């Protein structure tokens, strides 16, 4: 440790505050303390390698005195969020979690996003993308908020969602109604769901009294569908409770998110060397998770007042319901730890089986999908520490006029790894031929990486021109089968989308009056043949600007 830093530590004030270790002006560690003098003196006699490294690397120490520990806590969180020092513990997502974003436009739109970018209001994270899609679809039918990103000043006619009754139509002047829809959505996603349920019940009863049974049935179905989507998460509580439940063991943290009595998410994060206080700072104060009224913990935190952050209560359970939730969270934590143990064992077995030098922490898998050589695509999926990392998945379009899986694999491998770093292990869906194609491609770009395959028929592991037969319940085979199934699923879904778009282009080429511009408009607006078939003549005419040509489109379809 440099002498000037040692002197500054000895002169540190006894007040609460934040301290910043820097190297060449860049913060490398930011901490807080109830008494700066006591905390900083611990760096004079380091007990851990991390503390020792901070002291050795730092060439400058800055202290900021504040009024109390709460202010220190908030300032520390904001500074860490701003500078992201390398020695501060960070949350590591163990999976991809979606958010619902309401944009900060003058007339907001609503979308599902992968991560927060601080450019709107975010709700989440949620456990399942499909759950969020289903939820937003139902809520849009009820409220009518917009999901398009179009520049509303340039729109002269409403889109087909308006004509389907799913959008209020702020593009044609219904601004106040849309503002009310966005308000209701914010309230609902914040956990105040009663207003929406009461609205649907009232509408259903009103139409029933008027003998308008068709509309009464519509609101009844919306009410049932909304309840079913929320209940699909598996747990419903009679009390309209809004809380998060946080438990942790070792470096793993699990959060159960309950809104209005519905379990809307179970998420898990890894934080090396972090405690509950670190997690609250990194997850809630930095804005990764929306703040509920109540945060249930296994025990009290030391004299920290979290009310100024938005919590009404932070601490151990106060009721039987909260105790039940804590038990559920603990069971989920146990399952997560068990799964991680099994995955680690499988990866260690895989490392031994393939005689690898490095632990296969990151595995990337490739699969090819085509229809007799047409619409060829490739998928690339990523597994880290034995679990899918969906945010890193990629898709590739391959142009070829005849089926050739080997050439397709060579193409994808070269495109991927000429620009991106290699994984610890590359997985290819296929046998010796596919594996060798990947190895050849790597050699062509001057790179080397272990490549393993899984032959489809007998699920035989292929490595270095040899076949390895494993029992069906072997942990390595189970892991490779999961990777194979995921690469196949991702490839097939992209292939289907490409085939639908190409089919749409092919059909539209046969319609007199449909040139490149009109064809592009139809594809961008409808996306598939099925959507055009279900559209009205008027809607198609609005998109392409001609009723006569719209009629030709429907005639051919």
From Swiss-Prot:
HAMAP family, per database record: UvrC
Natural source organism: Thermotoga maritima (strain ATCC 43589 / DSM 3109 / JCM 10099 / NBRC 100826 / MSB8)
Family per record: Belongs to the UvrC family.
Gene from which the chain derives: uvrC
Molecular-function GO terms, alphabetical: DNA binding; excinuclease ABC activity
Domain UVR: from-to ranges: 194-229
Domain GIY-YIG: 14-89
Domain of life assignment: Bacteria
Protein name: UvrABC system protein C
Keyword terms of this UniProt record: Cytoplasm, DNA damage, DNA excision, DNA repair, Excision nuclease, SOS response
Matches recorded under SMART domains: GIYc
Cellular component annotations (GO), alphabetically ordered: cytoplasm; excinuclease repair complex
Subunit structure as annotated in this protein's UniProt entry: Interacts with UvrB in an incision complex.
InterPro entries per the UniProt record, alphabetical: GIY-YIG_endonuc, GIY-YIG_endonuc_sf, GIY-YIG_UvrC_Cho, RuvA_2-like, UVR_dom, UVR_dom_sf, UvrABC_protein_C, UvrC
Described function: The UvrABC repair system catalyzes the recognition and processing of DNA lesions. UvrC both incises the 5' and 3' sides of the lesion. The N-terminal half is responsible for the 3' incision and the C-terminal half is responsible for the 5' incision.
One Pfam family this sequence matches: UvrC_RNaseH_dom
Location within or outside the cell: Cytoplasm
GO biological process, one term: SOS response
Signal peptide feature range: none
CDD domains: GIY-YIG_UvrC_Cho (cd10434)
